[in-house]
């Protein structure tokens, strides 16, 4: 039979193929078993079940079977008979019996031994296996149909004798395949793979087989033909050199390598793996391809061809680099060479010749060069599934010997035929196949499969034909007429399987199977394939792998290829991790699944020859269970997962197990998220809920995080910020190999996922409202909204998230909706909620279809990073707070101290009357006024002129005057416009004001309210007093300064009747003016009076002012303001809790800011309590108090901007006499008594702390105003009073109590005019404003002269003092040293030490107060400084440093935090806690120890082992400060302390200057830093001195055009308060 078959069918006529089309439909008919049963004497193989045989193509498989044992031959023959029978039946030809001579031939070669009879475990392992109902087509074990018409197919005639016997069949197939219909029709008959369709290795094996079977007459000719044809193909590549030893390169023969790796593909591989154009040109020039290319990484010795690299590649590369202008960098290129060798080794190890080449690349390389359907991208490589290989020999696991000849095939080693092929290379493979394949292969294959990475992307040697493509599979799919055909479906699956998400498609251009059950289960195709597809890898494939030296271990490595990241990348949407929304997912049993993975699997591993590939595992259900087995294995292998997110809301799981390179990892992460430009994407570490991310991970940190933080539970979470998302290729239709478009998979975006229902009303209500008419584009819609709502703070890309949860359309519509005005407040209050919503929306939007280019988004992101938006919303400018405070009383005005207790009580009862309509109080005012007036006269010895009553009553306006004088005006001032009324009242205290008031009689009507206050009695006088607004006469008229008024600490109604009359007249006008801006007016009045030294006003006046403060604000405006509220009510919300507030910490306000906010900085002190006038120690206060009221008014008028401040100052300065008295009513008597007691029984003039402070500040301010320079620095820079040698009393109130309720402020006993030998200063300590080396710094004020100062205090806990005496001694010694060192220093750039006070458990140092804070705090808050500022600050610091060194003082702790920056640009060196005085300032002192801050230390400080160091360590520290100012961060910013110590001490390295600094600053600045960083080798003599740098260095030259007020830094820090 066999002989007949050979004779009859060797020249298989093509015509029968024409019949095959019809036969293709008959494939389902089972072949007649009886005919062949007899031919199978051994019956080793069970008779194939009826039905179309999906078994492997007869070609190689048959050849292998013939080479195999007689049993195998018989089995093969049986298979042949089945296949032939079917074909014969369909074609009308009887299947020829297998040729018996083949067995002896095979036996002669000993191949039979290498191929064992299939085990019972693998019942259907032979190539003749008849597929069952659930197994059919190329994907289920039957090789894809081969392109018989191809000339290479004829070369297939070179197959072994058995193949030649089947030759007729081949011919038959070829003829039928000519039109492709044969394949379609004869789907049951596995196409005989031609040399092309089958891997070169297979073809070679065939040759070898034929050579072996050359004894057969007809075979030899064919054999020679096939060999010749095959040899020619591989020789295409000029670099296709065969190893003489015929060893395989990476599992490929040299010919195969030439086909697999043509030059184009090598160049593409280089490009994809990031090799420069120079490398590509080098390879192109040297024509490195095929075996030469693979030799580079995996030469004969397994280590790569180093000679070639160094003798040819690198020299040529150097030329290319020079030619291209890149420049030759040997280290870089050597590193690239190493990387290349490693990547090429991966190609060998992974059995994937495409390693490192994206699937797309592979697609190109795999595209059928022989006319295979290029149009089917998926088919390009995937169709190769069962393809010719499986069909040939792979399907019959027992027939592997032929592959051994593979490596020799191209070398045309006929000797391969003569030599026992199995022994050459197949020994390993045959052993493997027999042992592992049959017995242990299932375990082995499983373990191997688990590790497989991207086999489907790589074509194993067996997978690919000599051309690099499995032509047969393509043709089979292509030719298959219907998508329903197995081949078609397989192809379709490939397309559909491309990846679960379109994003995947964009990432991998290969046809990954997404719908397979494997993908559903997350298994790899090869893994699932093992169970699903029974096609066993041909022995050839196994041989090729074995020849590459691959073992099972190599398989697991496969997934480590660079490609792997592509596969992993698709995890989010990959077939291995399909999203639940994927519509194409099919049940595990779906034939689609079976075919999906099939194409690659058989070729993925030789292990598939094992019995575990038996049919029993083919059912998808089996694959399902198999998957579950396999699924656990990756975890066992240490799978590493990472969660990645674009918005912090939606996370995708990415498998980063095999991402060995950072580029691969980045690309995988970005492709998973749909970011096309992964190179520019930023990756941050994140945690759920984290919204702010500081610095993106660089490559090193990313690799470290992957290595240390990633694990099997996804502990590593990454936030990715890309320029824009990669558009999902939804528009690119998926095509099966047959060109049938497949439904596109849903992208990861919500639009393509399962449809989502629109948000319900409740959900929508939670979203910031937006107009329904918003534009459809979410981003565009949001833009208009931004200016209106807080949403504007967020980048547009975030904003779109408002539509979270909506359908894309709805989301678009609603995104643009602007919030309704009525909800603006709600949005502001719920910003956090809004952020969350926006975050969700961003995620939603980002996933919605191809995202629109977010040009604005990026900019907004940058803007957001700048912190402008969020910062502004969260923090209200303290400066604004100050303004608000200005408008309202800054403190609760205490009761007027002047009033008697009775009056106080009466006024307290009547206090609310002022709130009543002015008209009513006016009437009552007279009645009560008389009573109260008499009472006031009696108690306070104050006579209120009768005119006072008439004054208010006479004219409403005049009453208004009266009232205006009172607090009503003051209250009005607060509420009324500041500048104009104030100016008017101040400017026109006289008639003009009166005219106004007369005009505004209505406002005067409220003034009866003032009268109502007058009804209290004393208010009458008070009002009149106020009426005496006139600056000159009245204040001076206060001849009563020493009157009883002082006794009661109540401002005397020093205004005489005339004064009152004047007040009534001018006061009226003033009241009107004050009505316009009463607060200022009132303050001015009080200020005037105080200026006249009449510090006390009649209680009524005080009361009025108090009432005004409470509610008379309406008095000025008339009935419009009925201020019934108490002073507390009118008082604004507290401006600030304290200096310690986080956002204001270390930002010290200017002195005037402190004065204006004394209550905030000295919260527990009654700043308005009067105390005896100090000794002559407080010159600033007395002149201020004595200053004529005109001065105050003039100041206020000149300073409209600070009018409120002026007003406050006036009021505060007036304290007791101010319109807004602050003492409690009962305080008056007490204070009076105290004054009497303290003064020795005599009456003295009382002053309050507020008065003194404001007086001093006013005088200083007036000076600055007159000079035309309003810089706060000038005010601050006034000379402070030194207190060394004086007696200092520090007053610090107990928490929660006011000084007025505690012991009185210490009074000076000596008369003010008599100087004391030892002056006494009373220092009041306020809020904490900073921390020093050993102590805390508090705000202080000198109660005697009003100077603001800083109190540095070290307090020792008495309980700890006994325990840690050494620490206490150290602290005390440090403070003493600081005091002794600094008390005599005076320099504009050194903080002035004013005095000290030693207590039992504390030491206090009084320092000059510097506003603005330290340079370090400015750097942290505002970033690096511009060079002009750095230059100025450096020059000033050098000046101070030169002065210190001249005085013999080493600072030793110079850093940005210890240099204070005034608001006028002056910097001062501070914190001399560890400074030291020495005689030889620039000589090394061995007693100098290691002190200071590590990052600013000089090397000699750390290295000082008995040698010591000099003051030049301060020069080094100064260089560090300059670097700190330029860089915006400390020196050694990337080092920890220990690292800096090592580099300084051991390596004597200077802190590195960052590139962004060195590239932007001037050469002079660089030179200055380098000079400061001069590293001493023996001593520091080479480092310049401070004086040298100051006078000679170009960087320290003064710039005449420099003005700090014009700098950006000043603009940032000017509003400190």
UniProtKB/Swiss-Prot annotation:
Residues in Protein kinase domain copies: 1323-1596
GO terms (molecular function) for this protein are: ATP binding; protein kinase activity
Q: SUPFAM superfamilies from the xrefs?
A: Protein kinase-like (PK-like)
> A Gene Ontology biological process annotation?
MAPK cascade
Tell me which residues bind ATP: 1329-1337, 1352
Specify residue ranges for compositional bias: Low complexity: 19-28
Q: Its catalytic activity?
A: L-seryl-[protein] + ATP = O-phospho-L-seryl-[protein] + ADP + H(+); L-threonyl-[protein] + ATP = O-phospho-L-threonyl-[protein] + ADP + H(+)
Phenotype of null mutants: Results in severe sensitivity against cell wall-disturbing compounds congo red or calcofluor white, and drastic alterations of the fungal morphology. Impairs phosphorylation of mpkA.
Query: What keywords would UniProt list here?
Result: ATP-binding, Kinase, Nucleotide-binding, Transferase, Virulence
List where Basic and acidic residues composition bias occurs.
Answer: 524-533, 832-841, 871-885, 1128-1140, 1189-1198
> What start-end ranges are recorded for coiled-coil regions in this protein?
none
Main EC class of this protein?
transferase
Q: Where is the composition biased (Pro residues)?
A: 44-60
The record's listing under Gene3D superfamilies reads:
Transferase(Phosphotransferase) domain 1
The EC number on file is: 2.7.11.24
Q: Where is this region: Disordered?
A: 1-73, 167-199, 211-253, 345-399, 455-555, 568-633, 739-820, 832-1144, 1165-1277
Sequence ranges of Polar residues compositional bias: 220-248, 482-504, 535-555, 586-596, 897-907, 956-980, 1199-1208, 1257-1272
Q: Which family does it belong to?
A: Belongs to the protein kinase superfamily. STE Ser/Thr protein kinase family. MAP kinase kinase kinase subfamily.
Q: What does the UniProt function comment say about this protein?
A: Mitogen-activated protein kinase kinase kinase; part of cell wall integrity (CWI) signaling pathway composed of pkcA, the bck1-mkk2-mpka MAPK cascade and the downstream rlmA transcription regulator. The CWI signaling pathway regulates cell wall integrity and pyomelanin formation. CWI also controls oxidative stress response, gliotoxin production, iron adaptation and asexual development. Finally, CWI is constitutively required for A.fumigatus to cope with the temperature increase found in the mammalian lung environment, during infection.
Q: What is the protein's given name? A: Mitogen-activated protein kinase kinae kinase bck1
The UniProt gene name for this protein comes to bck1
């Amino acid at each position: 039979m066999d002989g007949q078959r050979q004779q009859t069918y060797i020249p298989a006529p093509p015509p029968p193929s024409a019949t095959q089309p019809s036969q293709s439909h008959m494939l389902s008919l089972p072949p007649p078993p009886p005919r062949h049963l007899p031919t199978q004497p051994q019956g080793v193989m069970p008779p194939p079940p009826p039905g179309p045989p999906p078994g492997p193509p007869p070609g190689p498989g048959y050849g292998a079977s013939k080479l195999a044992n007689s049993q195998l031959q018989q089995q093969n023959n049986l298979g042949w008979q089945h296949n032939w029978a079917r074909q014969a039946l369909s074609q009308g030809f009887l299947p020829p019996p297998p040729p018996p001579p083949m067995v002896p031939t095979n036996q002669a070669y000993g191949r039979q031994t290498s191929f064992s009879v299939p085990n019972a475990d693998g019942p259907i392992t032979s190539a003749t296996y008849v597929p069952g109902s659930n197994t059919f087509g190329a994907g289920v074990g039957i090789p894809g149909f081969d392109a018989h018409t191809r000339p290479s197919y004829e070369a297939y005639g070179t197959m072994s004798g058995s193949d030649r016997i089947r030759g007729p069949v081949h011919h038959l197939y070829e003829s039928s395949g000519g039109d492709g219909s044969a394949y379609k029709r004869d789907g049951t008959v596995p196409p005989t793979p031609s040399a092309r369709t089958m891997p070169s290795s297979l073809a070679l094996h065939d040759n070898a087989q034929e050579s072996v079977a050359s004894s057969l007459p007809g075979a030899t000719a064919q054999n020679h033909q096939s060999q010749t044809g095959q040899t020619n193909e591989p020789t295409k590549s000029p670099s296709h050199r065969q190893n003489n030893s015929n060893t395989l390169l990476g599992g490929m023969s040299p010919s195969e390598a030439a086909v697999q790796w043509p030059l184009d593909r090598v160049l593409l591989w280089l490009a994809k793996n990031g090799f420069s154009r120079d490398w590509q040109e080098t390879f192109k020039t040297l024509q490195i391809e095929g075996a030469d290319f693979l030799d580079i990484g995996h030469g004969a010795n397994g280590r790569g061809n180093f000679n070639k690299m160094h003798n040819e590649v690198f020299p040529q590369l150097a030329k290319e680099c020079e030619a291209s202008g890149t420049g030759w960098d040997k280290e870089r290129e050597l590193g690239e060479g190493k990387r290349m060798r490693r990547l090429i080794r991966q190609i060998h190890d992974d059995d994937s010749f495409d390693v490192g080449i994206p699937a797309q690349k592979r697609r190109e390389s795999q595209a059928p060069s022989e006319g295979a359907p290029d149009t089917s991208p998926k088919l390009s490589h995937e169709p190769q599934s069962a393809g010719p290989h499986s069909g040939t020999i792979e399907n019959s696991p027992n027939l592997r010997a032929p592959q051994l000849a593979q490596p020799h095939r191209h070398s045309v080693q006929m000797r391969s035929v003569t030599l026992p092929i199995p022994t050459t290379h197949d020994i390993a493979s045959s052993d493997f196949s027999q042992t592992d394949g049959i017995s242990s292969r299932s375990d082995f294959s499983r373990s191997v499969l688990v590790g497989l990475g991207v086999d489907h992307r790589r074509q194993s040697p067996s997978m690919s034909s000599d051309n690099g493509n499995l032509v047969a599979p393509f043709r089979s799919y292509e030719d298959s007429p219907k998508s329903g055909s197995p081949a078609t479906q397989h192809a379709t699956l490939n397309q559909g399987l491309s990846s679960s998400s379109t994003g995947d498609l964009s990432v991998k251009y290969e046809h990954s199977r997404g719908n397979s059950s494997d993908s559903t289960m997350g298994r790899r195709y090869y893994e699932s394939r093992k169970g699903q597809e029974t096609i066993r890898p041909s022995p050839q494939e196994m041989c090729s792998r074995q020849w590459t030296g691959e073992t099972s271990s190599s398989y697991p490595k496969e997934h480590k290829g660079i490609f792997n990241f592509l596969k992993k990348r698709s995890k989010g949407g990959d077939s291995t991790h399909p999203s639940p929304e994927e519509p194409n997912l099919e049940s595990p049993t779906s034939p689609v699944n079976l075919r999906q993975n099939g194409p690659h699997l058989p070729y993925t591993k030789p292990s598939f020859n094992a019995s575990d590939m038996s049919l029993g595992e083919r059912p998808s259900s089996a694959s399902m269970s198999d998957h579950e087995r396999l699924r656990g294995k990756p975890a066992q292998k240490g799978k590493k997962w990472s969660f990645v997110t674009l918005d912090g809301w939606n996370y995708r799981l990415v498998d980063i197990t095999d991402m060995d390179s950072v580029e691969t990892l980045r690309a995988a992460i970005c492709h998973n998220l749909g970011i096309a430009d992964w190179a520019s994407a930023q990756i941050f570490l994140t945690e759920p809920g984290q919204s702010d991310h500081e610095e993106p991970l660089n490559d090193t940190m990313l690799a470290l995080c992957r290595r240390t933080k990633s694990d099997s539970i996804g502990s590593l979470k990454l936030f990715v910020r890309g320029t824009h998302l990669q558009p999902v290729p939804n528009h690119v239709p998926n095509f099966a190999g047959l060109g049938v478009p497949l439904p596109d998979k849903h992208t990861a975006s919500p639009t393509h996922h399962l449809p989502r229902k629109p948000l319900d009303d409740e959900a929508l209500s939670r979203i910031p409202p937006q107009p329904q008419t918003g534009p459809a584009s979410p981003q565009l819609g949001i833009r208009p909204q931004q200016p209106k709502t807080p949403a504007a703070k967020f980048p547009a890309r975030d904003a779109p998230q408002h539509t979270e949860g909506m359908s894309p359309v709805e989301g678009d519509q609603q995104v643009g909706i602007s919030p309704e005005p009525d909800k603006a407040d709600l949005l502001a209050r719920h910003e956090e909620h809004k952020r969350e919503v926006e975050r969700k929306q961003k995620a939603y939007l980002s996933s919605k279809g191809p995202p629109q280019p977010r040009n604005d988004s990026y900019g907004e992101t940058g803007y957001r990073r700048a912190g402008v938006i969020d910062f502004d919303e969260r923090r209200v400018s303290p400066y604004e707070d100050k303004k608000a405070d200005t408008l309202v009383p800054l403190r609760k005005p205490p009761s007027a101290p002047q009033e008697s207790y009775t009056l106080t009580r009466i006024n307290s009862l009547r206090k609310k009357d002022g709130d009543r309509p002015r008209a009513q109080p006016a009437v009552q005012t007279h009645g009560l006024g008389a009573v109260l007036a008499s009472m006031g006269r009696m108690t306070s010895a104050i006579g209120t002129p009768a005119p006072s009553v008439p004054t208010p009553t006479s004219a409403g306006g005049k009453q208004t005057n009266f009232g205006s004088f009172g607090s009503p005006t003051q209250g009005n001032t607060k509420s009324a416009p500041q500048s104009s009324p104030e100016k008017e009242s101040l400017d026109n205290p006289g008639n003009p004001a009166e005219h106004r008031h007369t005009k505004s009689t209505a406002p005067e009507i409220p003034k009866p309210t003032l009268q109502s206050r007058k009804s209290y009695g004393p208010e009458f006088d008070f009002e009149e007093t106020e009426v005496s607004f006139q600056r000159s006469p009245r204040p001076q008229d206060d001849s009563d300064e020493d009157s009883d008024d002082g006794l009661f600490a109540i401002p005397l109604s020093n205004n005489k009747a005339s004064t009152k009359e004047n007040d009534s007249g001018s006061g009226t006008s003033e009241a009107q003016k004050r009505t316009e801006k009463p607060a200022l007016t009132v303050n001015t009045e009080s200020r005037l009076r105080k200026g006249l030294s009449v510090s006390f006003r009649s209680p009524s006046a005080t009361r009025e002012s108090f009432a005004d403060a409470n509610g008379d604000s309406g008095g000025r405006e008339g009935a419009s303001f009925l201020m019934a509220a108490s002073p507390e009510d009118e008082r604004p919300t507290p401006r600030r809790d304290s200096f310690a507030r986080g956002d204001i910490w270390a930002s010290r306000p200017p002195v005037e800011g402190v004065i204006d906010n004394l209550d905030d900085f000295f919260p527990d002190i009654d700043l308005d309590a009067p105390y005896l006038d100090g000794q002559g120690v407080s010159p600033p206060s007395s002149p201020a108090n004595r200053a004529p009221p005109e001065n105050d008014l003039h100041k206020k008028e000149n300073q409209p901007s600070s009018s409120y401040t002026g007003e406050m100052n006036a009021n505060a300065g007036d304290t007791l006499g101010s319109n807004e008295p602050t003492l409690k009513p009962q305080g008056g008597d007490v204070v009076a008594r105290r004054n009497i007691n303290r003064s020795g029984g005599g009456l003295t003039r009382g002053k309050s702390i507020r008065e003194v402070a404001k007086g001093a500040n006013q005088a200083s301010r007036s000076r600055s105003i007159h000079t035309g320079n309003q810089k706060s620095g000038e005010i601050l820079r006034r000379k402070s009073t030194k207190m060394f040698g004086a007696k200092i009393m520090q007053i610090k109130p107990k928490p929660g109590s006011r000084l007025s309720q505690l012991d009185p402020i210490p009074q000076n006993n000596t008369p003010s005019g008599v100087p004391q030998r030892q002056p006494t200063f009373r220092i009041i300590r306020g809020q904490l404003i900073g921390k020093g080396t050993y102590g805390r710094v508090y705000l202080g004020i000198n109660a005697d002269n009003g100077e603001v100062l800083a109190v540095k205090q070290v307090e020792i806990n008495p309980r700890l003092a006994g325990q840690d005496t050494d620490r206490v001694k150290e602290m005390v010694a440090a403070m003493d040293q600081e005091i002794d060192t600094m008390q005599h220093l005076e320099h504009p750039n050194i903080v002035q030490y004013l005095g000290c006070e030693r207590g039992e458990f504390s030491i206090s140092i009084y320092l000059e107060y510097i506003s603005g804070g330290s340079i370090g705090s400015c750097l942290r808050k505002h970033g690096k400084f511009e060079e002009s500022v750095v230059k100025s600050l450096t020059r000033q610091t050098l000046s101070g440093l030169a002065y210190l060194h001249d005085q013999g003082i080493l600072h030793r702790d110079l850093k940005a935090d210890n240099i204070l920056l005034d608001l006028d640009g002056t910097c001062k060196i501070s914190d001399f806690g560890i400074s030291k005085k020495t005689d030889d300032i620039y000589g090394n002192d061995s007693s100098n120890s290691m002190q200071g801050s590590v990052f600013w230390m000089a090397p000699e400080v750390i290295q000082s082992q008995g040698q010591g160091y000099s003051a030049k360590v301060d020069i080094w520290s100064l260089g560090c400060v300059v670097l700190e100012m330029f860089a915006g961060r400390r020196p050694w910013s990337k080092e920890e302390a220990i690292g800096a110590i090592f580099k300084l001490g051991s390596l004597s390295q200077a802190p590195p200057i960052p590139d962004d600094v060195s590239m932007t600053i001037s050469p002079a600045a660089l030179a200055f830093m380098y000079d400061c960083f001069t590293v001493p080798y023996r001593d520091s003599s080479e480092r310049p001195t401070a004086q040298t740098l100051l006078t000679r260095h170009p960087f320290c030259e003064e710039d005449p055009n420099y003005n700090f007020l014009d700098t950006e830094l000043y603009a940032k820090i000017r509003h400190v308060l």
